[in-house]
């Protein structure tokens, strides 16, 4: 404000009066500078009365009235000065100040510019003009005003610092930095410039330089409040919490009632884990500034951390009452609603937060997470990408986007996201765990184990990582601290169930651990409830279902839902069933949840079902369920359960009146939306019905089925070469199989038929005997040619016009035959030598994945091998990294390494066929061989099992019961060992049991898909009749034997 009283008008008064006027003018000026405006005005009025035309006095009066907010009086005296001297630039500038204060910015700017035209070197005019231009939004004009002032006086370090502030606000950080540096060069002790320069470095991410400059500012000016606050803020962001606290406390010593500083200090306490102290400090900030939404929001965060969720919710709501557009409170309140299960309200709040603040990265990420939970994967992906666009170093968003991409089957995209999250934040435990899961699903178990362990080092209390690590260790048979691991895993599940959290153990893995039946059922139930949560957001009204078959011309419509219509064990088991249903009474729909894999398995189901619908092309669960309902399905069959590719949300929507679990999942769904589980008396005894959420629906023999007779008919017959027999004919040293086997044998001379006695069924293998005819090729030139082909690794030879192929070369001869899609057309030779198996030993085998082996199972096997000296155990490298662990534990149990032989995993046809080479299969009691059990039994190899308490541990007993081989089912560990030892030491007994299995696989119902389909139809009709009569689902444990097609 121009207020000079210099250059007063000339006077003819005596010298004494002149001095008196001059002295009074100087006194008034000093009083003005000191802020004593009342005294300054009083003395100026004396001067004005003495000299009413003195422009210096008029300017000072204008300035005094301006400072006292008497704008009209200020304008009056400026106008008087202009009347006295129309060229007085300071008067125009003072008048501009009045206009600016009144908000009349254009008038103010015009007066400042007029002042500068009158006096081009008028520094205050430039400064005032710059301020007005900033207020008017003309930033570039303001910059030019400051530059003009500095051209006249380059040493104005305050003006240069102000110019730096303006440039910083414009984002021109390098130019701002140059201004601050020049100001410091001009005045090294100018604390404000040091602090401002610290702000620039902070904005540029140069944290340590920012800290240095803020510390320099407070050193120069120990009472510089803003510098202490800035220092505290940057130390807080750098997570140097102790020094941040010290800076904030110093600021509070300068300004004890500074609410924002109290709030920032509380944030540091919160980050330090001093939750109670943080809460108290937030409350102090609110006490000082009751209308402080940030403090309420942060207080709520601390209260939530302490577990006071209801109080936290109140605080978020208070913050929103104070500021309905407080984005952080909207976002954080949404988090609470989400945790409470109020998903729709959470979505509404997240969307509101984004309306208020579209560039809110955390809200985008949180909304995306909920959308992913609802199955809206594309929309979720869009919001994750927005979050990352806004915040390119947002590690959480990268990690969560990886989860979405993983669910969308984009494994490479997920891998890139997790890797990027870890690059941004190497200490991000969740990202390490997610990366581990990708490795786990890809079969890279060692990498998965390493990543899970890294996650647990970073975050020791991490149930998901611990339980997944436990599963990985189970996969590779790493039993280090096994008992302790199992105890901890059980305690984790117990705590999670008690707190109503989603358990970290997957339902499909629960059978591997010593969990109670109640826990296993509860784990499945939680996953079933997740499906309900996903479909509830669709707000679909319940479907209306028919009570009769009028609309389907009296036929029962059955819908099979699976992601495994293709090259998958489930299709290997049931692919013929859709085409075997009675077309007069059943209409079959197959709903594929996965795209066409191009295999014959898919083609067969597509061709033989009445209707085949690819639901993978309808990703929306609501629309897919609509399609099922429109098809008028009466019984909808869930063949996935909680296995990969499942869409249980379809069943949660209940598009069919009856919904049943069948075949593909070895356990209960735990879901209210599944009515029945198709099982049998051996697998699911009625006395354990409480283990299931579904009602038990019994098949008369076994619920399990295999399509082996259709896929592998060439294994119905076999011939052997009499190789090193020493008078004893073995049926599993060198074996020939083929569709044309009989014709080939007829072309050979000297083929002998050896009669193999075998029990004729029943519990007692010695009760009665029948003979099986086994062709034996003697050692002659033909046999020698076959053996030479094997020894030399030849792919195929021709004998008497028949193609004889090496059993290891089926993939090279016919890949579709190797996968089981076609029946091999050649005679295939399978030998023990191909797999490094001893010719003269008893070969026990197990072809399951290694995760089904536990320490107690390996101990039983070791005991058996010790009791049968000339014996070996044949396992698969499934996975290969498990082999050294098994070998090490076996050696610790006293077994030499050569007693366990490992082979690689083989294509399906070879896998089934080579099972003939083993003498006995030793089943895994923890989780039986299900499909592999059927495979080995079709190969004619006896399987010893010991049923446990879970469905998964009783399937083999069900298969053997159906086969009529009860003598192979043990009731205890000791009996299991004794059965296996008797088979390994009593060769006549072994021969009889092998003959029985070889015969019964053809004559029993186990592999009879036509009979099985008829029995299944009868069960479906029971379900329908029960429903049509108006009854709720109930156990169906007295199935009717089928004598003719239902």
Curated annotation (Swiss-Prot):
Complexes and interactors: Monomer; may exist in different oligomerization states in cells. Homotrimer, oligomerizes via TPR repeats 6 and 7. Trimerization is not necessary for activity in vitro, however it increases affinity for UDP-GlcNAc. Component of a THAP1/THAP3-HCFC1-OGT complex. Component of the NSL complex at least composed of MOF/KAT8, KANSL1, KANSL2, KANSL3, MCRS1, PHF20, OGT1/OGT, WDR5 and HCFC1. Found in a complex with KIF5B, RHOT1, RHOT2 and TRAK1. Found in a complex composed of at least SINHCAF, SIN3A, HDAC1, SAP30, RBBP4, OGT and TET1.
High-level lineage: Eukaryota, Metazoa, Chordata, Craniata, Vertebrata
Segments annotated as TPR repeats: 21-54, 89-122, 123-156, 157-190, 191-224, 225-258, 259-292, 293-326, 327-360, 361-394, 395-428, 429-462, 463-473
Pathway: Protein modification; protein glycosylation
Domain statement: The TPR repeat domain is required for substrate binding and oligomerization.
Protein name (record): UDP-N-acetylglucosamine--peptide N-acetylglucosaminyltransferase 110 kDa subunit
Post-translational modification: Ubiquitinated by the SCF(FBXO31) complex, leading to its proteasomal degradation. Phosphorylation on Ser-3 or Ser-4 by GSK3-beta positively regulates its activity. Phosphorylation at Thr-454 by AMPK promotes nuclear localization.
Glycan-modified residues: 3-4, 399
Organism encoding this protein: Mus musculus (Mouse)
Keyword Ubl conjugation assigned: yes
Residue positions of the active site: 508 (proton acceptor)
Reactions accelerated catalytically: L-seryl-[protein] + UDP-N-acetyl-alpha-D-glucosamine = 3-O-(N-acetyl-beta-D-glucosaminyl)-L-seryl-[protein] + UDP + H(+); L-threonyl-[protein] + UDP-N-acetyl-alpha-D-glucosamine = 3-O-(N-acetyl-beta-D-glucosaminyl)-L-threonyl-[protein] + UDP + H(+)
GO molecular function list: catalytic activity; chromatin DNA binding; N-acetyltransferase activity; phosphatidylinositol-3,4,5-trisphosphate binding; protein O-acetylglucosaminyltransferase activity
Residues where N-acetylalanine is found: 2
EC number: 2.4.1.255
